[in-house]
């Protein structure tokens, strides 16, 4: 048995996971692609040292920012964390905002081959001179099945599909259709997607961004920028990072950077709702206030 807590950013997932871990002798397992990176503690709202002392937390801040981490790498680490928790007689509690990680955990993972760096670099240079609709038309000419699955403005996924096709000569769809066995089936978990009121969530997002700035997010981003990492790396594209780097370079004001960071985060939260609705159909939607009662009542009946 394991507990799964998904949900949009700033919805109270981490606090709920900590309360459940204290109640159920649990281990909190990070299921958020940005909280993996040790470079961004404040800006990703990772658990504090005090919170980590209250209950075991694993896979938080465990990856260097220069690593282009993948869902496959996370799944390997999640398997180890799950085995260790169960071996210790503890309740595994997976918590985070990365829907793709939860999908891989409960539905299996497509075995997509890695793309050589040379091909990735060539295609990214090519993409710089093209609009996203043009890239989508190019994908449609090469891989019509995958192009039909993607929106014409989804630049990141279009480029990924092109990379796989150029590297393998096969459609990304073919790899996606062949999935490995899931690490946990839905019959082995209690899974919730936290669904707070949207207006309240937006206010929480804005307040939290201001709080993170007060707690040193700008200085954290300055240290990250000083590393000279490739701007295409995931850690360099975390919400708020590009705008705060521009503020540090004097290109925009800090106030404008904060406003843009908040807007990006609100848009991301909207996408998290959409992903869960379509890709995590078996997760129970509950408000943050309802979720703890849901878990505890279910556990008491088992």
Curated annotation (Swiss-Prot):
Catalytic activity, as annotated: adenosine(37) in tRNA + dimethylallyl diphosphate = N(6)-dimethylallyladenosine(37) in tRNA + diphosphate
Residues where substrate binds: 9-14
Cofactor(s) listed: Mg(2+)
Region of interest: Interaction with substrate tRNA: 32-35, 156-160
Assembly and oligomerization: Monomer.
Family the UniProt entry places it in: Belongs to the IPP transferase family.
Protein name: tRNA dimethylallyltransferase
Higher taxonomy: Bacteria, Pseudomonadati, Pseudomonadota, Alphaproteobacteria, Hyphomicrobiales
């Amino acid at each position: 048995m394991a507990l799964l807590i998904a949900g949009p950013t700033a919805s109270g997932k981490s606090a709920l996971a900590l309360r459940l871990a204290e109640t159920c002798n649990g281990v909190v397992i990070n299921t958020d692609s940005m909280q993996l990176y040790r470079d961004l503690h404040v800006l990703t709202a990772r658990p504090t040292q005090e919170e980590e002392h209250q209950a075991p937390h694993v896979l938080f801040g465990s990856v260097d920012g220069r690593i282009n981490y993948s869902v496959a790498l996370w799944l390997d680490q999640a398997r180890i964390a799950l085995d260790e928790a169960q071996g210790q007689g503890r309740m595994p509690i997976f918590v985070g905002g990365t829907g793709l990680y939860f999908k891989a955990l409960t539905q299996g993972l497509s075995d997509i081959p890695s793309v050589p760096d040379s091909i990735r670099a060539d295609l990214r240079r090519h993409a710089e001179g093209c609009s996203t609709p043009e890239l989508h038309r190019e994908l449609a000419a090469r891989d019509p099945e995958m192009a039909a699955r993607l929106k014409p403005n989804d630049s990141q996924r279009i480029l990924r599909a092109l990379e796989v096709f150029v590297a393998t000569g096969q459609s990304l769809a073919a790899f996606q259709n062949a999935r490995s066995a899931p690490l946990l089936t839905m019959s082995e978990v209690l899974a919730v997607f936290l669904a707070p009121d949207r207006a309240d969530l937006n206010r929480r997002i804005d307040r939290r961004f201001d709080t993170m700035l007060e707690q040193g997010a700008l200085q954290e981003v300055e240290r990250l920028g000083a590393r000279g990492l490739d701007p295409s790396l995931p850690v360099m594209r975390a919400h708020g990072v590009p705008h705060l780097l521009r503020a540090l370079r004097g290109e925009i004001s800090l106030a404008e950077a904060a406003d843009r960071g908040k807007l990006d985060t609100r848009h991301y939260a909207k996408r998290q709702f959409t992903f869960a609705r379509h890709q995590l159909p078996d997760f129970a939607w509950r408000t943050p206030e309802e979720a703890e009662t849901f878990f505890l009542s279910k556990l008491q009946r088992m």
